[in-house]
Amino acid sequence: AYFSDISSEIYLIASLLLLTPILIKKIPIPKPNLKESNSFLLSVRNLFETDKNFKNLCLAYLFIGLSNGITSILFILFVENIIGVSPLNFLIIYFGSAFLGLPIIYSLGLKFDKQKVWVFFIILACITFIPVYFLSNGDTYQFMTVCILSGFCLGADLILPASIQANIVSNAQETKNSVLSGKIYSVWSLIQKLSLALSAGICLPAIGYFGFNPSEGQYLLTPLSFAYGIMPIILRLPAIFFASNLKKN
């Protein structure tokens, strides 16, 4: 079927999203004399209940993951069917902008409050995607601009939440005098995989249900434009709310 023909490209994008954090320089966390807690679920539940920063960060990161997952999974379909060109060059521009923007975003995170910088780029990503729904065949330069700006915002989504999380880990371990880093990173990894799985499992069947299913000769483009151009904006709105509620450590 048509969707299976692009599975290799989708796997490539998914792999890049999951492997990118490996390329980001790890932030050192102090290692005081801490006690290891035996109960994983109890520790995580207790952290969610007592640390509002951790809860807000996880919720914001989940919605950001869903938004980025949908745009990444539908990227090739959108470029081929709406813009009408090969997606390779736009993929290079998109991910290239993300990587090139990392040093700039890292510097901004050091100079200003990381939470405020992240919220700014979440809002910028929403503004950048507003024209996407209205793009049509041949709008290559307009979509190239979207790729550059949204790729830059993707860099912020990759580096700033991880940096904020490192601060939360350090603060929580000092407050509770127990080892929490492994548990928190496990939750973080689960959120990454869950958001990507939900994006793939929901958006592709949804656009097929509403009329875009090339394997059955259905080429209604409105569902594809809505899913790629509008849904990521909607999903980022709760992320703005939760990220705005993060308090500076």
Set out the residue ranges of the language-model regions.
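Membrane-embedded alpha-helical bundles of multi-pass transporters/translocases
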Residues: 1-249
